[in-house]
């Protein structure tokens, strides 16, 4: 759901970016029917979605890696250690972005993310933590998926509002920004 929400919000703001989703478990699985419904409520289409596994190549090409849980960020950092400064859980990224304030137009995304990550250590992501983890709605009711989608939409809004606060321009937003959303 985050891939669709993030891509939709970036499109709405006129930000040119490539957004991909990758997970830890499955390749080729369709989106859960409840995910499809929750996104259809927002006029976002998941009908053609197929899951894919996170790979070193995908991580290497991403300017930002967003995990739904700490374990996703840990696995990304284990697969490719240099991804650590640009890998966050969605909740962590929204929290750190809110604390830091909007990215100035003259500061590249990579530099702004490095500032957000400056005081972190890899041990910060040991174990699970509800303050960082988005509960996985798989196997739950449509109502649970809709509540999850509301939370994700709010968090994505915070992230985009801080990463791309100004009207986009070719100088402020490189068209090759790539964002990877990692889910289980």
Language-model features: locations:
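Short polar/charged helix/loop
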Residues: 1-184
């Amino acid at each position: 759901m985050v891939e669709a929400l993030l891509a939709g919000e970036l499109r709405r703001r006129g930000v040119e970016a490539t957004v991909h989703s990758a997970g830890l478990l499955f390749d080729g699985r369709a989106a859960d029917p409840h995910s499809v419904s929750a996104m259809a409520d927002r006029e976002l289409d998941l009908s053609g979605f197929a899951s894919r596994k996170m790979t070193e190549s995908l991580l290497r090409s991403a300017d930002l890696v967003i995990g739904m849980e700490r374990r996703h960020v840990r696995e990304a950092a284990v697969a490719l250690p240099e991804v650590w400064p640009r890998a966050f859980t969605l909740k962590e990224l929204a929290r750190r972005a809110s604390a830091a304030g909007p990215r100035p137009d003259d500061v590249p995304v990579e530099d702004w993310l490095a500032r957000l990550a400056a005081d972190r250590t890899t041990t910060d992501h040991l174990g699970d933590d509800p303050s960082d983890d988005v509960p996985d709605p798989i196997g739950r009711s449509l109502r649970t998926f809709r509540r999850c989608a509301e939370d994700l939409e709010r968090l994505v809004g915070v992230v985009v509002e801080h990463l791309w606060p100004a009207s986009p321009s070719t100088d402020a937003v490189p068209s090759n920004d790539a964002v990877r959303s990692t889910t289980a």
